[in-house]
């Protein structure tokens, strides 16, 4: 790779070091070799990018690295462009902000930083979350079957959702009171909404009837305000997925799933299913089914489970 840079007349000597001038990009020069001829991070990243393209012929080469490394990746991409590689534009820096904590795991609120020694291991966070979730389950529903499994699904999911709900480039504070809140814009809230939907469907024996349900009979159903709002939100799912993927922004999906959960709960509270005419009951069961299915798919894309009971 160094030889290629030399052959393309891209290396310039500066104070005994070898650099690539990036003035045309409005960037400081990229340090390729130190004065003792040792390599740098960007040297190794250039070589790695070349190897990945050769071995995998990637369509996108995505670097998920903290915002603080923005300049580094701007220089990396600029050097690849200077080397004449059009695929340099397919190298994407997906940056993210910092996390501070308010918890006895660290004892103080501080930015997580390996260099400063302010570190929590992810396994410790996940184990703590599962432990706290099990305590909540024992307080609220101690008779729940498989509660240890549910605690794991909800506890781990809560941490994932908290991370992905926040816009990725923004710093945020990790607080157990928010993460494990069953009533806020959280993973447990969304998972509980899906469990509620499953309970309704199970009580009405919906899953055994679904294959014989004549959906065409529901086409002329006149929806009320809450039903229509939920249907409109569900209809946006495909566009939300495309937008989230295009922008490398999982928070778009996480916030959308939360919106659907809120609208479903509003529908649940205002639109009774039992003791209704058959057409009304069938429509509301189908809408409940679609809501749960959407939440389950959405959470799955975020790496979360969807418990049937909570």
Predicted regions and their residues:
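Non-catalytic interaction-recognition regions
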Residues: 1-310
């Amino acid at each position: 790779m160094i030889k290629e840079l030399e052959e393309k007349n891209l290396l310039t000597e500066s104070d005994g070091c070898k650099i690539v001038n990036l003035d045309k990009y409005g960037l400081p020069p990229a340090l390729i070799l130190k004065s003792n001829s040792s390599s740098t991070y960007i040297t190794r990243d250039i070589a790695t990018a070349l190897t990945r393209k050769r071995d995998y012929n990637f369509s996108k080469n995505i670097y998920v690295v903290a915002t603080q490394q923005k300049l580094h990746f701007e220089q990396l991409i600029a050097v690849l462009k200077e080397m004449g590689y059009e695929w340099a534009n397919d190298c994407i820096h997906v940056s993210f902000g910092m996390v501070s904590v308010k918890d006895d795991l660290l004892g103080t609120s501080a930015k997580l930083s390996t260099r400063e020694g302010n570190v929590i291991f992810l396994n410790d966070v996940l184990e703590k979350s599962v432990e706290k979730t099990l305590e909540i389950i024992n307080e609220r529903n101690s008779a729940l079957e498989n509660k240890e499994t549910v605690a794991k699904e909800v506890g781990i999911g809560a941490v994932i959702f908290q991370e992905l709900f926040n816009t990725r480039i923004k710093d945020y504070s990790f607080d157990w009171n928010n993460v494990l809140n069953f009533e806020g814009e959280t993973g447990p809230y969304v998972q509980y909404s899906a469990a509620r939907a499953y309970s309704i469907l199970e009580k009405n024996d919906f899953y055994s009837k679904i294959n014989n349900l004549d959906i065409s009979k529901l086409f002329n159903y006149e929806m009320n305000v809450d039903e229509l709002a939920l249907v409109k939100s569900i209809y946006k799912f495909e566009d939300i997925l495309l937008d989230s993927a295009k922008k490398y922004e999982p928070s778009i999906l996480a916030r959308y799933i939360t919106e659907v959960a809120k609208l479903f709960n509003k529908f649940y509270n205002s639109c009774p299913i039992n003791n209704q005419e058959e057409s009304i009951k069938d429509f509301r069961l189908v809408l409940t089914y679609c809501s749960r299915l959407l939440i389950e798919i959405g959470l799955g894309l975020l790496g979360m489970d969807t418990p049937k009971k909570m």
